[in-house]
Amino acid sequence: MTTNPSIEWLSNEGGVVTIGGSRRGIIFGHFGPAHECEVPSFEISSKAFSQHEIKNLFSEDTPVEELLRTSHLRLPTEGEWELAFQQKQISSVDGIEALIDYVPERGYWGQPTDGRPKGPRGFQIIRDWSNSKDGRPKTGLLFEDNQSVSFRLVREVPKAMIWDGDGDPLPTGPEPVRRAIEELLIAIFLGILPSFIWAFFNARPGYIQEGWPGLVLGGLFISAFSAIFWRPSYPEFKKDNKNS
């Protein structure tokens, strides 16, 4: 099967693009960690299609996945989409635009950085335009199949010419010693120390000597609760320095 000639293709020479964010926190944190991804050259469709439009283009009653596979087409990787968006080759659509990458809820830890699709296990990465206020869609995860999503197409090239080896992956997770020191310092300076300072100026005489276990536990609770809103940002992982 050949590619439908009515699809307008945009050529991109590839390049290095940053994916993910560094801000941490259960509610307000970014999907991260932020890292550079080296994207090889590709061609992406100028239009985002619905599943119904894809079937009409090829005039076949075949599952979309099979249509794309036999036509040597696929959804764009996050790196390809991000690079095309940054270079203003593509613009907004209504609703959600799906990408080919599948990653766990915990983020990009352990994922390749050479431009290949991330996955294969996890949730599908999306760009959600519905809440965009500045013209930039939100990164998100598609937790279940959604027939209303749209997607662009990328022309496949022989993968052996581009992707080999392990994909130069990110670390599998945050460095444990650094995390332990970070949590200890946050507990002391954000939770425990302020609790003792408050007690020193406001509690009755002798309260600190009698109630210090409660002050420590209260400080630890404050520290743990703060993780909902904030944790120190991770530095961006550069292509030449991902083990920092």
Name each model feature, range by range.
Residues 35, 95-189, 213-215, 229-244:
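Surface-exposed recognition segments
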Residues 44, 56-92:
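Conserved hydrophobic ligand-interaction patch in extracellular adhesion modules
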Residues 216-228:
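Alpha-helical membrane-embedded segments
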Residues 16, 48, 79-80, 103, ...:
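Short, flexible loop/turn elements at secondary-structure junctions
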Residues 11, 75-77, 98-99:
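A structural signal for short, well-ordered beta-strand segments and their strand-loop junctions
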Residues 205-219:
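Hydrophobic alpha-helical transmembrane segments
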Residues 2-62, 226-243:
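A short glycine-rich, aromatic-capped structural motif
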Residues 197-206:
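Juxtamembrane "helix-exit" motif on the non-cytosolic side of transmembrane helices
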